[in-house]
């Protein structure tokens, strides 16, 4: 939450208070990385599920508040192991490649303010869901 507050403060200092309707450009992007626990959790994981759901709710509230002001806020659900190694597990889609996550986050950031993705589910290609 502190990261979001400080990021927003900096975005408004750098780009002003004008809204998109007033002709302002996009000010920036804040991406929250969550897990499947933000949507549902298993028994005996109530506290984990509550903490993940609260991050998702924060992202949704900020998206509603900041979208018109030119700040793109997104919540991603990274449902799988993210590996920074280029190996058989990442090449085959057993694990999520960190580079693929980075490219996806860049794609989110580069979206035009007329259409923004606010939630995105990231899963390894081999995962059964």
Residue ranges and their predicted role:
Residues 1-2, 48, 53, 77, ...:
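Broad hydrophobic/π-residue packing in well-ordered secondary structure
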Residues 9-54, 59-60, 64-67:
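Catalytic loop of short-chain dehydrogenase/reductase
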